[in-house]
């Protein structure tokens, strides 16, 4: 997906069962002791020091790398153009299980946002217009679950448009379905991005002005 969008990708490279980089470091479920009622032995009974060391090993490098990536995009010299260039978009990508705690999740995609719904609104419109996938807003998780931490830290605090995509993981079980979903999501993101640019700079959009590319971030799930 990042390649299709010509966007930088920052990936945590660690399962959320080890450390959930998309949670505030002080949150208990950043290192969950259980998942769906099943104990995670390596996470049970950790001391404060053990939790701190794990945060330093997984959370801190991921968020430093993401911050550096965004800083680089925002400070990058630009060639003079005749139209305004939009700021980057932060898009985080995760997956969810079709059934959790015995309850089937009736959706294909979740589009999540916190206080800034600009890009999420456009993504939802694009997915619904396509008509092939069932999409839900702030599901199967939402801000109250603490999952918008990355959006807050790196999107909201900088004023960047942002959204989080949750994919039902039986739709991406094979390399073929992963590639197909990546192509679909890249198309959705590009269409939403173009709509945002058109709304912000209607004259530039009519003139075919250049825009910056989205940023992609993934905390392993």
Regions found by a protein language model. Give the residues of each.
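N-terminal catalytic or cofactor-binding beta/alpha core of small enzyme domains
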Residues: 1-90, 95-221
């Amino acid at each position: 997906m990042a390649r299709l969008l010509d966007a930088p990708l920052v990936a945590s490279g660690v399962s959320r069962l080890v450390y959930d980089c998309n949670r505030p470091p002080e949150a208990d479920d950043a290192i969950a002791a259980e998942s769906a009622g099943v104990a995670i032995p390596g996470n049970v009974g950790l001391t404060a020091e053990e939790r701190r060391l794990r945060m330093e090993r997984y959370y801190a490098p991921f968020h430093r790398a993401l911050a550096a990536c965004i800083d680089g995009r925002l400070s990058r010299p630009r060639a003079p153009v005749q139209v305004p260039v939009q700021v980057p978009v932060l898009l985080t990508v995760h997956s969810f299980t079709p059934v959790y705690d015995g309850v089937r999740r009736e959706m294909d995609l979740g589009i999540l946002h916190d206080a800034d719904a600009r890009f999420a609104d456009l993504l939802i419109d694009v997915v619904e217009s396509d008509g092939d996938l069932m999409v839900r807003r702030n599901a199967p998780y939402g801000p109250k679950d603490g999952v918008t931490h990355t959006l807050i830290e790196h999107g909201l605090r900088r004023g960047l448009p942002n959204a989080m995509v949750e994919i039902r993981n039986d739709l991406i079980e094979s390399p073929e379905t992963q590639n197909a979903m990546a192509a679909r999501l890249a198309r959705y993101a590009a269409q939403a991005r173009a709509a945002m640019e058109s709304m912000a700079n209607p004259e530039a959009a009519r003139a075919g002005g250049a825009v910056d590319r989205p940023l992609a971030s993934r905390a392993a799930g």
